[in-house]
Amino acid sequence: MKKYIVKCPGCGEVRDQYALHCPDDDALPRTEYFKKQIVPADMPGMWRYYDWLPVNGIIEKGSGRPVTYKSEGFAKELRLSDLNITFNGYWPENEGFIRTCSFKDLESFPTMQRLLENNERRVLVVASAGNTARAFAHVASITGYPLLLIVPKNSTHRLWTTEEDTSSVCTVTVDGDYYQAIAMAEKIAARDGFVSEGGARNVARRDGMGTVMLDAVLTTKSLPQHYFQAVGSGTGGISAWEAAMRLIEDGRFGNNMPRLHLAQNLPCAPLYSTWTGEQTNGNCPEEMYDDVLFNRKPPYLATGGVKDALDDTNGIIYGITNKEADEARKIFEENEGIDILPAPAIACAAIMKALEKGEIKADENIVLNITGGGQKRLEEELPTRQLSVDLALSPDDKDAENKILEKVAELLKNGGY
């Protein structure tokens, strides 16, 4: 018996389980699970939420999961009585075992599992500003699946791993931003022998990120009134919204749709600009507190995309300055006792701004998604190694595609994969 189907929320038609597009509209395909009430599984890491993940098996090794706990320190500092933090990262005494220190693992593991289930043999192509690349390198190293990473040159410091054997990973840098890395990746993924991971259209990525909301609600036993997250493309917000829809249908956790509070880093905040109509000018992404949050082409207007999620939840987008993020990060780390990545500091600052603007009340139930943390802690306890750069390119190089194809073929020939 099938576990799930994939439907188009635009036309309502059932599509292939691996579909990324509907032939009739621009909607993001969405999973519909036959099991309407989720039961946590006795499985490792994120597979605890196996019921609502679009997979029919698991990757046993290497998966962590979101961990939700009631905040004391940060909540007290902000005078919030019901702030719950969902932490994604490395924090052993708090059951945090995500070894990439980023919630991007929640996307990479189910995506990889689906490739394996589909007997996919093509090289997986991933464009990333760093954290997604690290997550896919982690799971590719565990499974031995061939992976081509295309990342901006300035993001290579994020390409580290705790795995020893990274021979299935080929890393290419582009002297440009994330958008230029995406453009290059799209060209390569269109070639024979390569497959794209699908981005926001990949239901495995979205449902994987949706486990943040699942963990929060199954831990607190109720849907929150407010959900905070820093976003680049906004896909994490879509994921939280879709998970909340399923939890409302589950029937055991209330029927209130959590209000989405999404945060972007000024001055490079396309979603914020689109949503508010305010134009922001700056040197992007160089002037950002965290350039992983810069995405020039977010899925805003697609059916089932960011705008629909905001409209359905009465959501809001905040523009956060570097100074606001830095101050919020210090307050969080001092009061919670764990280091966090720059991106979730944007979300911490958004909570502080929401309080100032009266968008939330001190006694309301709030979930804060800490999308990455514990890297300093991990580096103290575990050995890490940088991924080697196999090829460095200029986006203006007319022969760039051929050079990438040759490099991948060379690594394959030499047994790199």
Curated annotation (Swiss-Prot):
Keywords: Coenzyme M biosynthesis, Pyridoxal phosphate, Transferase
The protein's annotated pathway: Cofactor biosynthesis; coenzyme M biosynthesis
Entry keyword annotation includes Transferase: yes
Keyword flag Transit peptide: no
Entry GO MF terms: ATP binding; cysteate synthase activity; L-serine ammonia-lyase activity; magnesium ion binding; pyridoxal phosphate binding; serine racemase activity; threonine racemase activity
EC number annotated for this UniProt entry: 2.5.1.76
InterPro entries: Cysteate_synthase, TrpB-like_PALP, TrpB-like_PALP_sf
Pfam families: PALP (PF00291)
Cofactor list: pyridoxal 5'-phosphate
Signal sequence annotation: none
Quaternary data: Homotrimer.
Family of the protein in this entry: Belongs to the threonine synthase family. Cysteate synthase subfamily.
Role of this protein: Specifically catalyzes the beta-elimination of phosphate from L-phosphoserine and the beta-addition of sulfite to the dehydroalanine intermediate to produce L-cysteate.
Protein name, entry field: Cysteate synthase
The species this protein was found in: Methanococcoides burtonii (strain DSM 6242 / NBRC 107633 / OCM 468 / ACE-M)
Taxonomic lineage of the native organism: Archaea, Methanobacteriati, Methanobacteriota, Stenosarchaea group, Methanomicrobia
